[in-house]
UniProtKB/Swiss-Prot annotation:
Signal peptide: 1-21
Annotated protein name in UniProt: Tol-Pal system protein TolB
Function (record text): Part of the Tol-Pal system, which plays a role in outer membrane invagination during cell division and is important for maintaining outer membrane integrity.
Gene transcribed to yield this protein: tolB
Originating organism: Pseudomonas putida (strain ATCC 47054 / DSM 6125 / CFBP 8728 / NCIMB 11950 / KT2440)
Chief place of localization: periplasm
Family of this protein: Belongs to the TolB family.
GO biological process terms, semicolon-separated: cell division; protein import
Amino acid sequence: MIKRLRGLLVMLCCVAGMAVAEEKNILVTSGSDRATPIAVVPFGLQGGSVLPEDIADIIGNDLRNSGYYSPIPRQNMISQPSQASEVIFRDWKALGAQYVMVGSIVPSGGRLQVQYALFNVATEQQVLTGSVAGSTDQLRDMAHYIADQSFEKLTGIKGAFSTRMLYVTAERFSTNNTRYTLQRSDYDGARAVTLLQSREPILSPRFAPDGKRIAYVSFEQKRPRIFVQNIDTGRREQVTNFEGLNGAPAWSPDGSRLAFVLSKDGNPDIYVMNVASRQISRVTAGPGINTEPFWGKDGNTLYFTSDRGGKPQIYKQSVSGGGAERVTFVGNYNANPKLSADEKTLVMIHRQQGFTNFKVAAQDLQRGSVKILSETSLDESPTVAPNGTMLIYATRQQGRGVLMLVSLNGRVRLPLPTAQGEVREPSWSPYLN
């Protein structure tokens, strides 16, 4: 069984004897230029207390994860100023830093006041200054906020470090005793909280565009059904109860509709439901498996995986009618489509002709070229940050399911800290502020 047709092919075997896809475009396997050196100096703390989180470390990691910046190691810092007036620019020029951030933390009345300033080292000019306040429990929130502000000021791209992630863990205690847990965490895997536990599989969690609701597939009734749950209240509703497969939910950009896969009429096909009225309409038809829908920003186009041509490839089709158009031509396997924020890049699970490994790849939709982003194999379930700079995917390392973060420019690849057990099915939230 090929597992990459996530959600659907967990339950169905792939069709055998598939024809080889035609190679039409270019494959790029490596290469990227150097990230911009930046120094995020440890923030000064008044009062001599010890905080549970290192705010400067979190900011530096955020900027690194974007693939745009390379933080200078603390042990290399010649000086460690905490105020703008203490910055000696020759120290940072000697280290090759293009930017330096300093900051201070002042406890006051049970809260923390965090001040920060960012400088261009070459011009010796301040490019950003600000302050943010919160409790000790909000240190990570404040750090992500400062990283968001800094990233947007330097790049013009809205930061996505204050976003969240969904994922599923599976802990097997014995042959017939596995616990599945739906978790929500910071985008970097920190501060995980449990949203749902079940003795039956949970698949395909997806944030609604408002960030307040999620959709997912649950087997708690011994068959797949789609649920919608309010994150804050925990209230949940079953929204599908059709015979056969109910899988791969995907929210429309305005949150009013869900696309998903049903097999009630025979082959697995894509349908769209009005969430308020529960009315459904069929989008795809014909032979083969059609699955893994993903909405375009226009709210009318669906990208999806289909094996109608022999092997899994990605197609797009209007929900209002018309035929499907094939999108991918490089490789003999392309599945699980996701679009970048500007819709210029298609992220997918890709297998090259003549290889057996499944990789995360990005296709330039204008030129058709494909770039391999991951260095792992058996990759699945890519999910893209709302600003299109990073992605998270599931893979296997040392016999265990794990999550990996990759920058879309290919400069950063790192594992994310998660709970014990098999970790899978990541889904990135929209902007939450």
